């Protein structure tokens, strides 16, 4: 079962490009020009594999009278929900949360109680005390164009982020590539204390979009916390669209839209972690970055963000996902 293609460009104009964009684009071009055809194919493969098919045994679940799935459950997770709540009903196409709660606030409260119970029973681990908002796809895409998922009132509900994979919900995150003028890239190595992908290479800064945050404020926060960058520098990051990744993971279904930003780092500035989530930063050549991706030393999401940024530097890029070729022009 395929849930389709999500590979779109952000709304920034090339008719009046900023100086920051010109310099950034030149840096990314240098990165790409340094790659061999084989190395470019490694990046292509990242995007080809970004969206995995939903497992055949996955159980879709629906919110109220929704026609499209809200999320995807592992079979054992579906059984747990049916054992805990009477308003989760079995239907031929999956489960339906036939909740009497009709407002985002009341749904959120009901789900908060359910998520806490699942955590107490050991079905949800790594509790973060951070909430993500859930928007149906139709809210994110307006007339075919991506919009910032920042309007809390437009969300169907909000929930503890640790429970998102259990329920197979689509989350959002901001990822920032740190390029230098000579086409090198700053990459962080995740702390060994991280619950997910400890010790692996990552983008310079990245983090989930929490309730009430804008994409820009999320990026500025993450660049300060993870890389020690000033707000003034962080605000110069250039948006470059989004790429969605989804795959089966031990805790459930990972489904996340990654909002890509590129930042041109000053030559005399090295990122310095502030929150303990990054063990070290390394300035890597294009070849070293691609080698890390090929050898699975970089997280899947970070690799997709790098591939998205680099392969789109030349304007028109063909990417095959789930058997279909997508063409997008900057």
Task: Please state what every model-predicted region is.
Residues 283:
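Short aromatic/basic micro-patch
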Residues 1, 9-11:
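Acidic, Ala/Val/Gly-enriched low-complexity intrinsically disordered segments
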Residues 11-12, 16-200, 208-224, 229-272, ...:
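N-terminal leader/linker segments that precede catalytic domains of diphosphate-processing enzymes
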């Amino acid at each position: 079962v395929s849930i389709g293609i999500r590979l779109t460009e952000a709304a920034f104009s090339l008719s009046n490009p900023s100086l920051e964009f010109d310099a950034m684009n030149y840096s990314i071009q240098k990165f790409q020009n340094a790659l061999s055809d084989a190395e470019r194919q490694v990046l292509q493969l990242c995007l080809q594999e970004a969206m995995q098919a939903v497992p055949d045994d996955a159980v879709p679940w629906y919110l109220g009278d929704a026609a499209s799935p809200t999320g995807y459950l592992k079979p054992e997770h579906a059984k747990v929900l049916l054992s805990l709540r009477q308003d989760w009903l079995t239907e031929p196409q999956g489960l339906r949360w036939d909740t009497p709660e009709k407002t985002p606030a009341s749904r959120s409260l009901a789900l908060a109680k359910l998520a806490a119970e699942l955590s107490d029973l050991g079905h949800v681990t790594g509790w973060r005390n951070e909430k993500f908002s859930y928007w149906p796809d139709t809210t994110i895409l307006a007339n075919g164009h991506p919009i910032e998922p920042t309007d809390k009132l437009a969300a169907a509900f909000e929930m503890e982020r640790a429970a998102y994979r259990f329920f197979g919900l689509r989350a959002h995150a901001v990822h920032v590539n740190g390029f230098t003028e000579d086409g090198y890239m700053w990459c962080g190595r995740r702390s060994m204390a991280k619950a997910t992908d400890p010790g692996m290479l990552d983008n310079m800064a990245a983090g989930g979009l929490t309730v009430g945050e804008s994409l820009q404020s999320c990026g500025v926060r993450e660049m300060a916390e993870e890389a020690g960058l000033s707000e003034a520098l962080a605000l110069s990051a250039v948006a470059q669209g989004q790429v969605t990744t989804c795959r089966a993971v031990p805790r459930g279904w990972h489904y996340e839209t990654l909002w890509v930003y590129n930042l041109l780092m000053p030559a005399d500035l090295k990122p310095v972690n502030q929150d303990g989530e990054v063990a070290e930063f390394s300035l890597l050549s294009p070849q070293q970055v691609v080698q890390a991706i090929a050898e699975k030393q970089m997280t899947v999401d970070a690799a997709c963000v790098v591939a998205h940024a680099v392969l789109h530097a030349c304007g028109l890029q063909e990417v095959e996902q789930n058997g279909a070729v997508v063409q997008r022009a900057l």
